[in-house]
């Protein structure tokens, strides 16, 4: 997966609970073909998608990988935007079912490749292990919810010190300069994804996806999001109003509150937020949020802000450690399914399926 430059998450272990945008990675317009895989852990869903992605890349088809936020080494989805094809894992916690079965979506049932009798001796262990995995994810979610309160507190503190009018005027000038207006344009299409999130490894960010998607990137350096959120929100509205298709990359911790980045493919242009968790190795222009924020006023809350940042870091660490324990439990659960699978049949199916879809 290291050879693929474009990686996104379609789900996030956020401070608001698990947040899924799986249903926003395609349009039910009669042109997209969506294959939803159903099956248990360890049944080859990720390997199937990796095989498909590799073959698509061999044919020089633009291929987007969507790793799993609970295990970034595994895939949750593969998107071929130019061919309008999606393959995704439709199992919990990001359960996806067809809305337009046959016309748009089709289920790939991987239970067809396992031996039901192989589970007979392990039913109790499978249920207990599944429940333990769910309990650990709930514990991680509570750590994230607590962190969310502290992140929000710092955001509101910084927002109270931010000159909103000055920030908005800057955003307007920036958009007029970089985004050509279109007359009588229909609203553009928006694709919603993530490039970061909390995982068993800690916070992971695919910042390279943004810079690989655009020739020009405007980076807003803002640890609290008070100014960057105003700018990014305005960019989003302006681009959509002028008929540009955009990729909106939400904040993985508070997705209902923040949009972190906007990519406008038609213009080869991106606007990105740089903070404690997402860094860009780029010489691109940087806008520093402090020019819009009263540092004197913000300084009055420095102790609270410092405490919140330190406590958030500890809560994220605890959440990651808990997710790591959950992954170990999930790996054990996979073992029960692996020994029940007929991978030879699945491999043959993967080869035929891939040939049929790509040729």
Summary of predicted features, one role per range:
Residues 1, 48, 149:
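A detector of single, family-specific signature residues
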Residues 21-32, 40:
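Charged, compositionally biased non-catalytic regions
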Residues 1-26, 165, 169-209:
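N-terminal pre-Walker A segment at the start of P-loop NTPase domains
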Residues 34-53, 200-239:
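Glycine-rich phosphate-binding P-loop
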Residues 125-177, 307, 311-353:
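An accessory alpha-helical subdomain
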Residues 37-38, 48-49, 56, 64-67, ...:
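A cross-family "folded-core" feature that marks the main globular domain of proteins
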Residues 2-19, 54-118, 124-125, 236-317:
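Conserved nucleotide-sensing/catalytic segment adjacent to the nucleotide-binding pocket
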